[in-house]
């Protein structure tokens, strides 16, 4: 069941990515799939952590990327941008109690690829996470497991 859920979610997003010629899949979704399908009871796999961990990290990545690009320093200071993006993402996830390790990779993707648009937050991030979470909910219902509400910190 776990492998099927991962196959369906990553396959669907990869298909959208390929056939619509737009980004719908990013590398951090692979790690998210491992957590939400393979370890659904882990604190980092809770819906609140998955959703907000990626969302906050994408917002940080886009905002700081925008600043670096507008100042004209993205290329020569990409190393600094990478360090800032991931560090800020970790800090915000800790403060908001929404730590989701793949979120760090979501922020890092902004630095490495130079994403500086709000569209990146919507697609691939939010669309991809919503697709993956819907599939996770369906799988957990089929397995007879109830997963925590999105409003509960760390599913507690």
Regions found by a protein language model. Give the residues of each.
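Membrane-helix boundary connector in multi-pass membrane proteins
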Residues: 96-121
